[in-house]
């Protein structure tokens, strides 16, 4: 929603608004290619994070339906153009989901994308959400995945180990719970 986001960013950055420095703001996107290219023209030096979550189209489409409209090849090309325009490193966000995108082949593909873009990789273990079939990988698999990405020479790799997932208070877990009564 770039038309709504730009005025909001302007207000956040303005000394008459929140006055937050642009370099302290990271905009995360699912990967709408035309909007990434449009954002590249925005004058403030905000940072960009891409919710990649899969190294190939088949895997990414399971997690990110937007990939059907903007496949990885187009997304990576748009990221390259963003970087060329802005001269800023971007972040590739990658949620690790057991049995879906946590195999070492995906780690190799992720590292390849990161090298091409000279991008930071932020690995995020999935937080279990009631009613969803996905699960967090075992810690040994998370560490193996991270090691493989590093071994493949991704420029920078971080692993976000969040707190609160055991009490449903971590990223992606906060939501309204309602009981539905039948008529």
Task: Show where each model-derived region lies.
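Conserved AdoMet/S-adenosylmethionine-binding subsite of the radical SAM
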Residues: 1-154
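Radical SAM enzyme core and accessory elements
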Residues: 164-183
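Conserved phosphate-binding/catalytic loops in two-lobed NTP-binding clefts
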Residues: 151, 155-165
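Short, charged alpha-helical segments
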Residues: 140, 144, 162, 166-169
């Amino acid at each position: 929603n770039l038309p709504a986001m730009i005025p909001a960013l302007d207000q956040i950055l303005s000394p008459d608004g929140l006055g937050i420095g642009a370099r302290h703001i990271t905009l995360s996107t699912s990967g709408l290619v035309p909007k990434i290219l449009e954002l590249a023209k925005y004058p403030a030096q905000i940072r960009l994070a891409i919710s990649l979550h899969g190294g190939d189209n088949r895997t990414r489409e399971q997690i990110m339906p937007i990939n059907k409209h903007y496949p990885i090849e187009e997304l990576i090309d748009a990221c390259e153009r963003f970087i060329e325009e802005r001269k800023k490193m971007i972040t590739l966000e990658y949620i690790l989901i057991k049995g879906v995108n946590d195999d070492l082949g995906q780690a190799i593909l992720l590292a390849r994308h990161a090298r091409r873009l000279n991008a930071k990789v932020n690995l995020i273990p999935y937080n279990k959400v009631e009613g969803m079939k996905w699960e967090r990988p075992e810690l040994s698999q998370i560490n193996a995945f991270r090691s493989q990405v590093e071994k493949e020479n991704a420029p920078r790799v971080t692993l976000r180990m969040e707190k609160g997932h055991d009490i449903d208070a971590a990223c992606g877990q906060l939501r309204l719970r309602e009981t539905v009564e039948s008529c």
